A protein has these predicted regions:
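Glycine-rich phosphate/diphosphate-binding loop of Rossmann-like nucleotide-binding domains
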Residues: 51-63, 147-220
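Rossmann-like adenosine-cofactor binding region
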Residues: 196-273
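Phosphate-coordination loops involved in phosphoryl transfer and adenosine-cofactor binding
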Residues: 41-46, 153-157, 255
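Short, structured coil segments at secondary-structure junctions
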Residues: 68, 119-121, 179, 197-200, ...
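Adenosine-phosphate binding glycine-rich loop
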Residues: 255-256, 261-311
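Positively charged, low-complexity intrinsically disordered leader regions
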Residues: 1-59, 63
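Phosphate/diphosphate ligand-binding glycine-rich loop within oxidoreductases
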Residues: 35, 39-143, 266
């Protein structure tokens, strides 16, 4: 049973993951029918508390909450009392006193959502914490895969890019291995974290090996903002040896799909012809993200304290 919070997929059960995905199916049907003002969370409040920049995640959560009838509050660290020295815990106490029902937090420090969840009555959702996890991105990725293939059993998911700094890669790895998929990772050695094989991933020795027979090809952004020092010679060198172009997809399964959590560096992780091809699901991922986050917000509020408000 889904608990009070969603802090990561490392300790999430298969049952919880499938519950969210199953609920999201109905939410997407409502979205595609243009039913964007539902009463499910009427009278509830969802706050996004972001200490890092975001377009997709923040907007997706805000729309998900509004489509379900909830009120929304957006807080950026740059324009809040954080600039005056307020701690995360004190910010949490303040938001709790205002009777928020759900707090979606993005923070540069790994573990920040877990810390916040220990000090507030509101449900806490991890919208990305440092290089740790990004569970809702992985959930929308799973939804996109299942929508195409129907099941995860036997799927080969190739993840190429900046694995070391990617919270998306970690959440995908944690969830996909539980769901029965094979995860293969490929990146420069300087961008491959230690221990991923112990977590269930296979590390490919070449781009061709990573892509061979892959059902899903997922590119990851080079996170220059998290890098200190030269981890590879140049973006052009990276694109030449690690990027994915149309000519490389001949190694993948003929019915493969291409995914990317965004934002995409065109011509670096993926070429434009790959991004814009018919088998690219990058735009569909964005729509699926709204449906998945609608499902998550609905389930968290429903399950917490029997559906009672934070009063």
């Amino acid at each position: 049973m889904l608990g009070k919070d969603l802090l990561g997929l490392y300790d999430a059960s298969v049952e919880d993951i499938m519950l969210i995905l199953d609920t999201a199916v109905g939410m997407k049907k409502l979205l595609t029918q243009n039913l964007k003002k539902l009463p499910h969370l009427q009278g509830r409040t969802v706050t996004t508390l972001f200490y890092e920049n975001s377009t997709r995640t923040r907007c997706s959560f805000e729309l998900a909450a509004k489509y379900l009838g909830a009120g929304t509050v957006n807080i950026s660290a740059s324009s809040s009392s954080v600039q005056k020295g307020e701690t995360l815990i004190d910010t949490g106490y303040t938001l709790d006193a205002m009777k928020n029902d759900v707090i979606v937090i993005r923070h540069p420090m790994g573990g920040a959502p877990h810390l916040l969840a220990k000090h507030v009555k509101a449900s806490v959702v991890n919208g990305g914490d440092g290089m740790n996890e990004h569970p809702t991105q992985a959930l929308l990725d799973f939804y996109t895969m299942r929508e195409k293939f129907g099941s995860f059993k036997g799927l080969k998911v190739a993840i190429l890019g900046d694995i070391k700094h990617s919270r998306v890669a970690k959440s995908n790895l944690f969830g996909l291995t539980k769901l029965g998929a094979e995860v293969v990772m490929y990146s420069p050695a300087t961008l491959m974290p230690q221990g991923v094989e112990r977590m269930g991933a296979k590390v490919a020795r070449s781009r061709e090996e990573a892509l061979a027979g892959a059902n899903v090809v997922m590119g990851l952004r080079i996170q220059l903002e998290r890098m200190h020092g030269g981890l590879f010679p140049s973006l052009s060198e990276y694109a030449k040896y690690y990027g994915v172009g149309e000519e490389h997809l001949k190694y993948a399964d003929k019915d493969c799909i291409v995914m990317h959590p965004g934002p995409v560096n065109r011509g670096v992780e993926l070429t434009s012809d790959v991004i814009d091809a018919d088998n690219s699901k990058i735009t569909e991922q964005v729509l699926n993200g709204v449906a998945v986050r609608m499902a998550l917000l609905f389930l968290l509020v429903k399950n917490r304290q029997g559906g009672e408000k934070n009063e």
